[in-house]
């Protein structure tokens, strides 16, 4: 029986495609700007918003998005001050979100069937509303990067130089922190809080092995992320294992394979160079 005839699998493929575009664009900024630890902190802090949403009856994704954005702003503001180190600010909001989420979940009466999907992801349960959220956020992100690619790229590579060029570095950083937080929350249905940061870093790390060009990294990350999702989805269906974890496992295997290929290429290049020098 053809698996593509199932609506839930079609939704999963579309969700994976939109997420690949979104994470490919935002993840390239994260890796280039070296914000992986901050993004990990925002990812886990978003659990506080999920807990508040479940406890109050508000949409957990909406609550998580608000909480994640505020956490990102908090980290950005505190780390800009000289009296608080960036890693300390990240750790504080990371643990704050997790503690608030745990307390709210325990205070919520009854069983919470959606909680595991937020923690570990459940891409096969993606619905129309999730696709609309991913689609709208993807369009917004593409529009922002199309209009402001050069200043964003300048801040990503060297914020000090960007500031010397009179670019609005603080505004760009807060804008990107907003998009990072929204992307993380929008990706929770894919792989969950535990693994969400992987979608924003591993395809970009793989792409970075072969190119340092910012635009090329974005496009390569999107393609690699999409391939990882397709292989991971199919493998999870065949093996009957969680799809989110399988997608991340595939992406790591692709990175390790690419790293090996790159190392062999460098070794052969050095060998050829030495042989030419001897001649």
Locations of regions flagged by a protein language model:
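Hydrophobic alpha-helical transmembrane segments
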Residues: 13-18, 61-66, 91-92, 131-136, ...
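Transmembrane alpha-helical segments in multi-pass inner-membrane proteins
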Residues: 194-245
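Helix-loop-helix "hairpin" substructures at the membrane interface of multi-pass membrane proteins
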Residues: 130-202
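Alpha-helical transmembrane segments in multi-pass membrane proteins
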Residues: 15-24, 45, 49, 53, ...
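Transmembrane helix-bundle core of multi-pass membrane transporters
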Residues: 6-11, 82, 90-150
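Short loop segments and helix-boundary regions at transmembrane helix junctions
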Residues: 28-111, 207-219, 236-239, 263-264
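Membrane-interfacial amphipathic/re-entrant helices at transmembrane-helix boundaries
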Residues: 1-21
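Cytosolic-side transmembrane-helix boundaries in multi-pass membrane proteins
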Residues: 241-248, 252-279
């Amino acid at each position: 029986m053809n698996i593509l005839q199932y609506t839930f699998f079609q939704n999963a493929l579309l969700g994976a495609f939109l997420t690949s575009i979104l994470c490919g664009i935002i993840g390239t900024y994260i890796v280039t700007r070296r914000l992986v630890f901050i993004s990990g902190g925002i990812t886990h802090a978003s659990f506080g918003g999920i807990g508040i949403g479940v406890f109050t009856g508000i949409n957990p994704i909406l609550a998580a998005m608000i909480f994640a954005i505020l956490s990102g702003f908090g980290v950005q503001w505190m780390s800009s001050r000289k009296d608080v180190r960036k890693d300390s600010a990240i750790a504080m909001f990371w643990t704050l979100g997790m503690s608030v989420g745990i307390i709210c979940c325990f205070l919520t009466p009854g069983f919470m069937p959606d909680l595991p999907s937020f923690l570990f992801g459940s891409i096969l349960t993606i619905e129309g509303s999730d696709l609309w959220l991913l689609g709208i956020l993807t369009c917004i992100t593409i529009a922002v990067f199309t209009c402001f690619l050069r200043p964003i790229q300048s801040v990503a590579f060297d914020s000090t130089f960007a500031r010397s060029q009179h670019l609005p570095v603080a505004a760009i950083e807060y804008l990107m922190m907003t998009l990072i937080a929204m992307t993380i929350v929008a990706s929770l249905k894919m792989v969950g809080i535990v693994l969400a940061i992987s979608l924003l870093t591993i395809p970009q790390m793989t792409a970075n092995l072969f190119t340092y060009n910012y635009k090329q990294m974005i496009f390569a990350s999107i393609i690699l992320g999409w391939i990882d999702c397709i292989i991971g989805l199919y493998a999870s269906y065949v093996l009957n294992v969680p799809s989110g974890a399988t997608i991340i496992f595939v992406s790591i295997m692709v990175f390790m394979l690419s790293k090996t290929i790159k190392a062999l290429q460098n070794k052969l290049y050095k060998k050829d160079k030495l042989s030419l020098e001897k001649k």
